[in-house]
């Protein structure tokens, strides 16, 4: 495949997105809307960086996160962000999305509970508006908050798990991997598992985390985020293989975050050759200026995947969602209905 027809194939391909941080997924267009609401904030200097898109340096990407926190401090902001992000994923052909975000209190008076309620309201409004995407939510534990904040997040997740009509499905463990240790979070994560919540844990994002990774694999998690350096330990690889734990792989994020030096060296190839379950994801589509169609295209070009290989990756990803068996069956039916039209652009 080449040219516009190829790009159209990846756009038309129905896709599953399972590793998308809400704040990191905010697009340039949405950031400009938010900044226009807050003229009192001295962040106009950030406009140049925001407009750079794919040319942003890693440091500028980190600066973007700081600006995002400044301009998303009210319920109105969170509602706008949630709806815009969902609609952008839908426009890119994503049919099932698990968003994740850390509930936070803001100086503007937003509580953690209200934060989650607002995200769920955004999901509901998109559904009412007929946006063609099924969206669920994972509450994220930020490592920087330590075990106390983690316990609060688990309690919130348990409450919403019971009351949200299957919108809240689980928890994410993320944040700066150099802060704290996995053992700090074993108790709240175990409690979450016992409550029926699913666990998606960022593991082995940096080298020399073998001990922590092995500890957290003992839970075990239902999915692994990134897992960039899992392959440095044959013992860890065997544990992951034996338990068939799906990985969430984010190619552009790893390249821009400089944890992987080139597309060819990305661990996609390692796990693909093992026929191990994984799903392609964006991580932070706004900050890293990508989308899921682009991630599939990069993987296909780098690892010589045919359109049928690409289709299989997308279809198999349905099994790695945290959705119910009924939802998975409905998604598979939807994929098969769409398949003939999708492959018209693959020829």
UniProtKB/Swiss-Prot annotation:
Belongs to the metallo-dependent hydrolases superfamily. Adenosine and AMP deaminases family. It comes from the Eukaryota. It comes from Xenopus laevis (African clawed frog). This is N6-Methyl-AMP deaminase-L. GO terms for biological process: adenosine catabolic process; inosine biosynthetic process; nucleotide metabolic process. Pfam families: A_deaminase. Its EC number is 3.5.4.-. Catalyzes the hydrolysis of the free cytosolic methylated adenosine nucleotide N(6)-methyl-AMP (N6-mAMP) to produce inositol monophosphate (IMP) and methylamine. Is required for the catabolism of cytosolic N6-mAMP, which is derived from the degradation of mRNA containing N6-methylated adenine (m6A). One of its GO terms (molecular function) is metal ion binding. It catalyses: N(6)-methyl-AMP + H2O + H(+) = IMP + methylamine. Zn(2+) binds at residues 19, 21, 202, 283. The keyword Zinc applies. N(6)-methyl-AMP binds at residues 21, 23, 69, 101-104, 142, 175, 205, 283-284. Binds 1 zinc ion per subunit. The active site is at 205 (proton donor). Monomer.
């Amino acid at each position: 495949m080449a040219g516009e027809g190829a790009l159209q194939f990846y756009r038309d391909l129905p896709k599953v997105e399972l590793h998308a941080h809400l704040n990191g997924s905010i697009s340039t267009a949405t950031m400009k809307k938010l900044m226009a609401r807050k003229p009192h904030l001295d962040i106009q200097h950030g406009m140049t960086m925001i407009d750079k898109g794919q040319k942003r340096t890693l440091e500028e990407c980190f600066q973007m996160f700081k600006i995002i926190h400044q301009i998303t401090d009210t319920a109105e902001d969170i509602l706008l962000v949630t709806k815009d992000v969902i609609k952008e994923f839908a426009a890119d052909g994503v049919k099932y999305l698990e968003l994740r975000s850390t509930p936070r209190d803001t100086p503007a008076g937003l509580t953690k509970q209200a934060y989650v309620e607002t995200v769920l309201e955004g999901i509901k409004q998109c559904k009412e508006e007929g946006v063609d995407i099924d969206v669920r939510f994972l509450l994220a534990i930020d490592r920087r908050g330590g075990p106390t904040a983690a316990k609060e997040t688990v309690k919130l997740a348990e409450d919403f798990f019971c009351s949200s009509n299957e919108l809240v499905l689980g928890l994410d463990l993320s944040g700066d991997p150099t802060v704290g240790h996995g053992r700090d979070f074993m108790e709240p994560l175990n409690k979450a598992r016992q409550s029926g919540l699913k666990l998606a844990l960022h593991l082995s994002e940096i080298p020399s985390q073998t001990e922590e990774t092995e500890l957290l694999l003992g839970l075990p998690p239902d999915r692994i985020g990134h897992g960039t350096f899992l392959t440095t330990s044959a013992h860890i690889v065997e544990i992951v293989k034996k338990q068939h734990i799906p990985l969430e792989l984010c190619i552009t994020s790893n390249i821009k975050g400089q944890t992987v030096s080139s597309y060819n060296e990305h661990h996609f190839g390692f796990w693909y050759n093992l026929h191990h379950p994984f799903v392609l994801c964006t991580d932070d589509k706004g900050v890293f200026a990508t989308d899921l169609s682009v991630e599939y295209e990069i993987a296909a070009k780098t690892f010589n995947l045919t359109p049928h290989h690409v289709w299989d990756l997308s279809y198999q990803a349905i099994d790695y969602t945290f959705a119910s068996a009924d939802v998975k069956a409905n998604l598979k039916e939807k994929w098969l209905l769409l398949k003939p039209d999708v492959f018209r652009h693959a020829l």
